[in-house]
From Swiss-Prot:
Region Disordered, annotated ranges: 1-20, 28-72
Role played: Binds 16S rRNA, required for the assembly of 30S particles and may also be responsible for determining the conformation of the 16S rRNA at the A site.
Entry's family note: Belongs to the universal ribosomal protein uS14 family.
Superkingdom assignment: Bacteria
Keyword terms, alphabetized: Ribonucleoprotein, Ribosomal protein, RNA-binding, rRNA-binding
GO function term, MF aspect, one: rRNA binding
One BP annotation, GO: translation
Gene name as annotated: rpsN
The keyword Transmembrane helix appears for this protein: no
Record GO cellular component, one term: small ribosomal subunit
Subunit: Part of the 30S ribosomal subunit. Contacts proteins S3 and S10.
Official protein name in the record: Small ribosomal subunit protein uS14A
Basic and acidic residues biased stretches: 38-53, 61-70
Coiled coil regions, renumbered to chain: none
Length: 101
């Protein structure tokens, strides 16, 4: 089980990312567009730099939805490898079977 403070911090980061997502997308589009004047591009870069660090989506960590484990995460299920195995063996994941070859 991950520390509750780490899980809470990650949740706050997700909220911050959601709050700034549209403006960040607009600014990055202005910066990437080749037809943008240099002064406008610099202003967009400065505004992007002034935003909080936690507004970047890369700062959010994928965590297990059951216990918050940060490593061994499977996106398709939202679970870590440990909980994925336990729930698959218990039959809680429809369509998941143990492989044999």
């Amino acid at each position: 089980m991950a520390k509750k403070s780490k899980i809470a911090k990650n949740d706050r980061r997700q909220e911050t990312v959601a709050r700034y997502a549209t403006r960040r997308a607009e600014l990055t589009e202005i910066i990437r567009r080749p037809s943008t004047p240099e002064a406008e591009r610099r202003a967009a870069q400065q505004e992007l730099r002034r935003q909080p660090r936690d507004a970047s989506a890369t700062r959010v960590r994928n965590r297990d939805s059951v216990d918050g484990r940060p490593r061994g995460y499977h996106r398709a299920f939202g679970l870590s490898r440990v909980n994925l195995r336990e729930q698959a063996h218990a039959g809680f994941l429809p369509g998941v079977r143990k492989s044999s070859w």
